[in-house]
């Protein structure tokens, strides 16, 4: 009987733990995504701040590689950017990695092509999720919008 109760308790715990961590991971995903969008999708943020947050963007990409839809070509370009960025950061000047400043060509290439598509995909996914959430909620439009549609 003890073995039966112990086995039942273990099964219940194994069923609860993944469920609880799934919600935690999802909220962490949303927080991280919103943080990155506030930096990379905001035209008021300057390039030096964006450069400082590239490691965060890379960490997000590697943690959630399939959550953002990218074409195979875009994914390969992003992987190449990560490789180039890490290679640049490994270069030592007097025994230490580079201490800030612009790394020009790599960052320019990233913002011009791959980064823009990745951030746009990240933003579009957020917008699609927001629209599906709004479609399911019975809220009314703000009064200024109601006046415009009448």
Curated annotation (Swiss-Prot):
Its main location: secreted. The keyword Secreted applies. A humoral factor that may play a role in stress tolerance. It is found in: Secreted. Keywords: Immunity, Innate immunity, Secreted, Signal. The lineage of its organism: Eukaryota, Metazoa, Ecdysozoa, Arthropoda, Hexapoda. Residues 1-22 form the signal peptide. Disulfide bonds: none annotated. Residues 127-150 are annotated as: Disordered. This is Protein Turandot X1/X2. Transmembrane segments: none annotated. The keyword Calcium does not apply. Belongs to the Turandot family. Residues 132-150 have a biased composition (Polar residues). It comes from Drosophila sechellia. Pfam families: Turandot. The gene is TotX1. One of its GO terms (biological process) is response to bacterium. GO terms for cellular component: extracellular space.
């Amino acid at each position: 009987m003890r073995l039966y109760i112990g086995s039942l308790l273990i099964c219940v715990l194994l069923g609860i733990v993944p469920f609880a961590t799934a919600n935690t991971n999802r909220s962490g995903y949303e927080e991280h995504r919103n943080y990155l969008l506030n930096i990379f999708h905001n035209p008021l943020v300057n390039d030096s701040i964006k450069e400082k947050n590239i490691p965060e963007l890379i960490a997000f990409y590697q943690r959630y590689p399939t959550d953002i839809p990218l074409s195979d070509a875009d994914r390969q370009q992003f992987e190449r950017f990560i490789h180039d960025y890490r290679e640049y950061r490994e270069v030592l000047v007097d025994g230490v990695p580079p201490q800030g400043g612009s790394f020009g060509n790599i960052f320019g290439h990233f913002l011009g092509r791959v980064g823009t598509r990745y951030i746009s995909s990240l933003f579009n996914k957020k917008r699609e999720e927001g629209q599906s959430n709004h479609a399911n909620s019975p809220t009314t439009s703000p009064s200024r919008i109601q006046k415009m549609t009448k």
